[in-house]
């Protein structure tokens, strides 16, 4: 018998919602669809290092030699300051979970603790699993980001991450309680993927989570008409994808298809075969890959079952064709929209700009903006435009509202952080916005002329009548209209900014799934526009006449649906007080013309229509009482200070979280270092094999990496230790190492360093600025045979001795060779980049047009304590990506004192050219050739480099292999040219020009992203002996 479906607790308990890392397969998703850019969750603003300061001093004394006293003192000050300003974190433990949170998430942690164990048992029963109390799961609540999202990872231990914030209206607005819904979704991943080698694609891993989040029949994405819109629209256009096309998350639009199709496909299989049989898909089996596993469970070919599922998608009998607003806007990606008396503004995602279209059809750009923009709203007179987006600050990632003055063409100085959608009251002296604080939405009034005035008008959140507030719009007479949402159940609320009674449209009189509310004054009367839809229909247009309390709703589907509608033009012929239906019968013209977005599989177009063929429905308003919290029972089973208790007092925040106590178990990953060449069997001995062991606390505050790599000939084991501490936007790292030069096995190096990396918060996601610093001490042991005087170090340079060796050469033992005097090294690197990406629709060739610039500056110093000599090197680099043409060009240069550049060896110390100079090398790498001579024994040197890379072919494959767990992403063919001019001692410059071509295939192997290809390079011009053209492999992997 199939286990009975246990309904999720209604009202205060909700199913899952968002998704992310599963098993050893990592699933990344971000509600704002920015998971491709970032899929990493923002780090908290403060770090608490629960490690005695003396431990840092001891570590330094063992790894940094005579510098330990001053370095330890400086680090002690850093960590002492860190401990003083650190934010407290706490832990609540239930029967199966440990919930880690900051004080800002205390209430969310209590709510989660109340339901978590019951959810574990529910999902386990539906998947025929037995909950195991020994397999505890860590749940981390992040309160320092307003990008809603979540993730699950199984290694090194089971961990669920939830961003403690309100979810956006589109997509995830289908949940009554987003916190519990996201948790339920991630918990489904944790339980469903608890079997040997879970190699199923996201179409199935996301599909089962989306299906389970919708189990109660009223909420979840399967009960959101937006989900059905995509399925219906694709079928109408005869472009429904195969299962291989939606098996993985795409880099390009549309991004979230594994959620949409996976959830509906799982629901279809459960209806046809039953939930118990479907649960077998998530049991241990020797059939590891989806094609054979699916056949083993259902005795049906996956492709056949998929085609039957597509055939089962209902489509409307009659669908009208839309009318384009402009032929130029037939293909594109258009977002937020708002109307003014003279036209309307809209966001063009491909141009990364807010543009304004007037009634005559003229279009102009108001300002440039990144893709975090999610809402626009004009003041009544059209002068001010409220712009809602998301930015980074030093402490958090937050929503923001700014005011753009169309008269001056610039933004006003006021900024409202933590505020989401906004609208003006009247002509813009007052502004109302939705302030997001954790799970709560607070409709807030602000007087722009009085910065001290702020008034909360209404509140929504857990335990309140509405779970969220969306899309405020001015409705005239000092009243704001806003959508009060409890999942897909929506109420239209009317909230005065003064003390008059609040009113609402009763839920039973509301159109279903109302979204994207905007307002416009038409012939003296305020009209609201919005989109709405019932299940199994495309999104439709709706009006609400504020003065007549009347809805006017589309009663026919139109291809592409209707999204973000606004009044484009008011027409004079008809009398507004009469219904559009009556006017149409008499042959009269429509009252208004509407602009809106239609959503298709590969693009979004701008369309227009009038207000004819609308069905009128009068409604009666009822009082809306101030929000009052519903009674919330306290968690029934909590563990505080290591003991289970029946209840927990509201003031008890759980036990304190100490990062050092949560860093076990470690994660192990293999390390492979290939030899530089394969010219002889001896070179194979240069191969390095090893392991990386990583310790990290669940909250993401501290990370420790231990590395060990062994080389067989000559035998040597490199060891490395790196401890990283994350404090807001800055990473502090301590490194200690004993390693061998893998470029030529010419030296070993023992040392340590203290490093910092700061990513500065920018007001635009297209911009990035970082500063990296490092201070360290290195001591070398030279392995060159015959004291280095045979030219092995510098090349043919007249037999100059380039390093002092005290051993038996490269084939002797290396552990006990004497170390030279240490080098004290310091470096600073800073860089700025701007990158803008526009997607091309309707083609798989060159699907993205990337424009950008990158500028870097690096300054490094190395002081030889033995010879008391300084070496300084300054280098800079600029890279530019041109619009339209797939061409990237770069220029670089350096100036060195007792330091220089030596071909493939990179930057070197002039007195010890066998030793690499600290930091990166900006000059070109001269791909595919042996390089060129450079600065050796020269006190001064300089160089210049230039490179150009032209993409000949870029094809977006985006298809899953029918047999293997491989998703082929794209194939790229580049040709490039690199030029270097190097002038040792500022004289006798030498130059080399290298041409190369490369072919690279990018694909995902389970959760590993792989780049594999081949490169061929040859010299075009040189002032030295030519090198032999050659092939070289291209290979990289990233989890």
Curated annotation (Swiss-Prot):
<protein>
    <recommendedName>
        <fullName>Uncharacterized protein TP_0304</fullName>
    </recommendedName>
</protein>
